Amino acid sequence: MADAAPAGDAPPNAGAPAGEGGDGEIVGGPHNPQQIAAQKRLQQTQAQVDEVVDIMRTNVEKVLERDSKLSELDDRADALQQGASQFEQQAGKLKRKFWLQNLKMMIIMGVIGLVVVGIIANKLGLIGGEQPPQYQYPPQYMQPPPPPPQQPAGGQSSLVDAAGAGDGAGAGGSAGAGDHGGV
């Protein structure tokens, strides 16, 4: 610097720390412009180094934080995988259980259906040893009597004549007995 030295023997940088001048300059040595420029570059480089060190510290802290979060995520993923495996096993067991229940229900419904069809078929006479009931005449109508059996000639003609005499058919014998029964 171009300041004049104060009066006395004291150097101009007497209050500065040892090794540096009052303006941050190095004490002892010529103060030419090259040294001043070199010193400024050194200070700028030192500031840049300090800035890079701070950035690196921040980055290292972030990397450590990221690592802890990644390990936590890995633990969660393992727990989730284990839970998914257990869920899959339980779902398989439940599926088999309900499949068996469904199968049992289908078998029961099939047996019930067969029993109902069998009962209906039995009532309709489609199966079983019994014949369906034949048509019966209503009570007000009488079914015609079956024709009397044929009698041999000679031995019992008196009974036939007595039965036939009430009809007014005359004495026709056994030949006329079967002719008037179907009216």
UniProtKB/Swiss-Prot annotation:
Vesicular compartment residues: 128-183
CDD domains membership: R-SNARE_VAMP2 (cd15870)
Residues spanning the membrane: 107-127
Domain named v-SNARE coiled-coil homology: residues: 41-101
Biased amino acid composition, Pro residues: 141-151
One Pfam family recorded for the sequence: Synaptobrevin
Signal sequence, renumbered to the chain: none
Phenotype on disruption: Embryos develop normally, but their nerve terminals do not release transmitter in response to an action potential. Spontaneous neurotransmitter release is reduced, but not abolished. Slow degeneration in adult photoreceptor neurons is also observed: defects are caused by an accumulation of endosomal vesicles, leading to transmembrane protein degradation defects and a secondary increase in autophagy.
Lipid bilayer topology: Single-pass type IV membrane protein
Location within or outside the cell: Cytoplasmic vesicle, Secretory vesicle, Synaptic vesicle membrane; Early endosome membrane
Record keywords, A-Z: Cytoplasmic vesicle, Endosome, Membrane, Synapse, Transmembrane, Transmembrane helix
Summary of the function given for this chain in its UniProt record: Involved in the targeting and/or fusion of transport vesicles to their target membrane. Major SNARE protein of synaptic vesicles which mediates fusion of synaptic vesicles to release neurotransmitters. Essential for fast vesicular exocytosis and activity-dependent neurotransmitter release as well as fast endocytosis that mediates rapid reuse of synaptic vesicles. Also involved in a neuron-specific sort-and-degrade mechanism that promotes endolysosomal degradation and is required for neuronal maintenance.
Protein's name according to its UniProt entry: Neuronal synaptobrevin
Source organism of this protein record: Drosophila melanogaster
Taxonomic lineage from the root: Eukaryota, Metazoa, Ecdysozoa, Arthropoda, Hexapoda
Annotated gene: nSyb
